[in-house]
Amino acid sequence: MTDVTVKTLAAEIQTSVDRLVQQFADAGIPKSADDSVTAQEKQTLLSHLNREHGSAPDKLTLQRKTRSTLNVPGTGGKSKSVQIEVRKTRTFVKRDPQEAERLAAEEQAQREAEEQAQREAEITAKREAELKAEREAAEKAKRDASDKAKRDAAEKDKVSNQQTDEMTKTAQTEKARRENEAAELKRKAEEEARRKLEEDARRVAEEARRMAEENEKNGINPVEQTEDTSDYHVTTSQHARQAEDENDREVEGGRGRTRTASKTARPQKKGNKHAESKADREEARAAGRGGKGGKRKGSPLLQQGFQKPAQAVNRDVVIGETITVGDLANKMAVKGSQVIKAMMKLGAMATINQVIDQETAQLVAEEMGHKVILRRENELEEAVMSDRDTGAAAEPRAPVVTIMGHVDHGKTSLLDYIRSTKVASGEAGGITQHIGAYHVETDNGMITFLDTPGHAAFTSMRARGAQATDIVVLVVAADDGVMPQTIEAIQHAKAAQVPLVVAVNKIDKPEADMDRVKNELSQYGVMPEEWGGEAQFIPVSAKAGTGIDDLLNAILLQAEVLELKAIRNGMASGAVIESFLDKGRGPVATVLVREGTLNKGDIVLCGFEYGRVRAMRNELGQEVLEAGPSIPVEILGLSGVPAAGDEVTVVRDEKKAREVALYRQGKFREVKLARQQKSKLENMFANMTEGEVHEVNVVLKADVQGSVEAISDSLLKLSTDEVKVKIIGSGVGGITETDATLAAASNAILVGFNVRADASARKVIESESLDLRYYSVIYNLIDEVKAAMSGMLSPELKQQIIGLAEVRDVFKSPKFGAIAGCMVTEGNIKRHNPIRVLRDNVVIYEGELESLRRFKDDVNEVRNGMECGIGVKNYNDVRVGDMIEVFEIIEIQRTIA
């Protein structure tokens, strides 16, 4: 430690210099104010002051605080923090020398006393051990004397028993000789029987060995089985059975008791989990009664006797229309995790409580090796449908003819001429957008016509028309030939196995070519009769009326060949051709009766809907009371708008019809939800990028069900990878307040096709500023949705070269580095544009033009044929002969094709 002066020390201990000098003098150390003080001198001064002012403190107390936080769980599952402070106090006591000597003496005396007590305890223990050894020796001598006396008595008993045995042995020898003679004769007789038994036993053993080898080969371990020799109990009472067993043991107690006594007398270990109960011991003892010497052999108690089958058990699994994963696992007697694992292998994700459809459950069950029995849960529906009164007599009926073909080929005009009415002029845009059902009385008989739309959007309508028809009239324009919807109509007719009659329309035009139409149709399997085929080709003109009679005769001739018949009397059945919601009349369905007679007041079941026929009208709007086979009518009175294509059936009971309709609705909902929940692995990556896709939401309302279906399909087909059309809601009828609210909530476009919004809906549309559009032609609707989708597409970026400069020289600049002295050879060079540096026509750098100067002046643009200095940002390896290409990025708006 560095020495300090007296003055400094006085300042440290906060006392005066004179007082400190006086204290040093009293301690025998003469000092002045400027003299230095050593550590030894400080210690001497401190000792002097302690002696003078009294002793130093006897004890020193140290205090320490520690703070921490403890989380204590509280009510409601929440925890609260509690601040904890731990205070520790430690006291150090300075012992007086005399006191220390006194304490040391006390400790020494205590140690000596403990040693003395330990020595006395050892002596006492030694004395007790000697006394115990003496007692044990005396007891051993007493036991030896007693054992010797017992052995002497046993020896005497043994000698007497031997004498008695010798006397009885002589008598028994004579008796045994006589018995041996009789036994010899008996042995010879039994030997033959034993030989036969041994042969039988050898054969049985060989069979058992062979079966054991087969079981071992199949992986089945035989379980040792004990031979149950116990008697059957006469009574079922438990106490009576125990008493009966006790009596049996007393009677047969001599058998094997000596050998089993030691085993049964052993005490069981305390706490043994597998200790046998009393009933188990009784059962085991009873099972071993007849054994030799009391020995019994058997499988240990508590051993699992179930063995895993060598082969999987195949079960008959009955599956309804929907089933949960857990129920399917129970039916197959496997764990639910195994079913989920099997579904993941098939590419479907599911949980234990998820509802899956019948097809998925069938695939999973068959994959796991079980036989599937599909059950249709429609007993009520079958009972209602079977309880129908249909007449047995079938009568000839009128043919149902569907007119199909490409758009604008003259289908409706042809039918218009046949009916002698102006139907085509009433269609919006001059194209058919519904299925028109008409029956026409001709001189040769009645014909029912179905006029289908030819536009590409109405594929499902044409398919329904082909399914409900007997004959298809394919209209082909002689000047236009085969078109896409013509090919589609041929495919629908072939799928429905319906004969074709080809009407070559517009034959009066100068550019009409009949042979061209025949050649083109022959490529799709429609061969004319004159070429050896089956199709009739009739040249007609819907405008001039040429060939119309020939077409009708061809239709009736084809109908005669088909021999069309139907049951006229009885409960009717048919199909829904079209359906819509009329504001005044409610749900309206156009029904084509196939068989039976539909009467006003009949109870009908139609898909998910039911009701009583309140009124019927024909295609002219006239009220009718009944409709026979092949007659199209409009019916009123259904509970809702049915789907086009649904079966219409007349039933007896309205209550049962309602139950069937509700059952169909619930089942359809279950199946729909089950299919929606199915999440396949291949869709997982599509869902990951779903946020990057723009969506055009549409709420669609139309006048008829077929138009809703056609427009929905057309709009969904417009979807691309970047923009998707989503039909938020659709329906038949006018635009209501509910539709407007739905469009506002989902930010959707309201589209009305041949319908209008009511007053309440218009208020919501105005207040929410919704986009409402009315259409009457499907072309315009699709084009405008395409335009809306095009506006959501991200623009395409294109690079356009605006200038090219050749490096003539390179200069060094302290501010920008290498500066290229260039000559502009093409276009213009603009500042802050992206550039490319080309060397030998190869791009070696792509960056930004940082500096552009001409005659030491910064400029924004240099034109063709002028010199300039170019500084490239973050690039200094510019050489003479390089080309600097300047370009700009322009955006090009994309459109939906």
UniProtKB/Swiss-Prot annotation:
Region annotation G3: where it falls in the sequence:
451-454
Transcription regulation: present as a keyword of the record?
no
Q: Where is the composition biased (Basic and acidic residues)?
A: 85-159, 166-217, 273-286
Recall the GO molecular function terms of this protein's record: GTP binding; GTPase activity; guanosine tetraphosphate binding; translation initiation factor activity
Q: Where is this region: G4?
A: 505-508
Disordered: region residues: 52-310
Compositional bias of kind Basic residues: 256-272
Please note every region of biased composition (Polar residues): 68-82
Q: What does this protein do?
A: One of the essential components for the initiation of protein synthesis. Protects formylmethionyl-tRNA from spontaneous hydrolysis and promotes its binding to the 30S ribosomal subunits. Also involved in the hydrolysis of GTP during the formation of the 70S ribosomal complex.
Q: Which family does it belong to?
A: Belongs to the TRAFAC class translation factor GTPase superfamily. Classic translation factor GTPase family. IF-2 subfamily.
Q: What's the name of the protein?
A: Translation initiation factor IF-2
> Where is the organism placed in the taxonomic lineage, from the top?
Bacteria, Pseudomonadati, Pseudomonadota, Gammaproteobacteria, Enterobacterales
